[in-house]
Amino acid sequence: DSYTGTGSGFALSSDGYIATCNHVTEDAKHIQVTGINGDFTRFYNAQVILSDPMTDLSVIKINDPEFKTLGEVNYDLRPDVPVEGEPCYAIGYPRADLLGDNVKVTNGIISAVNAGKAGPVFCQISVPVTYGNSGGPLIDGNGNVLGIISAGYGDKAGYMANLAVKASYLKLLLESDPVLRKLTFKPILVKRSLTEIVRQVKDNVYLIKVSNSEPESSKNNIVTDKSINSIPRPELQDNGNRVSVLYEVKEKH
């Protein structure tokens, strides 16, 4: 089937819940996930369960009779604020149309804990990311999720600033839902080599393909958005300018 965009996502539970970015899924009438258990020959239909445009977060769930399991989730969503200078790694599927559907890993540091006009939800990172990385996990030196890759900005002088949503905001989103708040994670407390981290995490990171039109072959299987929620938080109130700045950043990426 044809698709209009791609993104990345990562497992929240073995039974099919996946985190990604709202801007990846918000206009999609058809969402498919591939790369489950390393298999890119099979595509599974998914639906949006919960989303928050203010934090650019979305939770989807595989809704496909052929689906069995995502396997064990062996990482935590970090509840604390990242630290400037902290090493971090992006795992995802940038430009899958050109670079193929094997997972890509890039590294860098936390450049700033807050991302200026984009607001306290986001941290700035030096990790190279591009189209298709959106929704993928930003991993710390233990293999836990620090953030979710969201946006990037580049100017004519060559300055690049990439943004990730802090994982603590994903935890808040999950806690707003009576089902998702029951999800549990396994904190990894010991630092490991990058090769060990990638080996552990990569099978829980997936390629998401979206289409703005409903394909004829799947009309009976598509399920549209079940619920759209936004979390009320003091630091996110009256932030229309902040959100518009973020979307402007995305358009320039």
Label each PLM-derived region with a short phrase:
Residues 1, 28, 46, 64-70, ...:
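C-terminal cap/linker of serine protease catalytic domains
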Residues 1-32, 217-229, 252-253:
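Catalytic histidine site
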Residues 2-3, 117, 127-131:
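Short loop/turn motifs at secondary-structure junctions and domain boundaries
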Residues 5, 56, 134:
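Beta-rich catalytic cores
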Residues 10-11, 128-149:
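Catalytic nucleophile loop of clan PA
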Residues 13-100, 118-122, 178-191, 214-216:
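Conserved active-site neighborhood of the chymotrypsin/trypsin-like protease fold
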Residues 54, 79-83, 104, 129-133, ...:
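Soluble non-cytosolic domains of exported or imported proteins
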Residues 102-114:
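Short, compositionally biased
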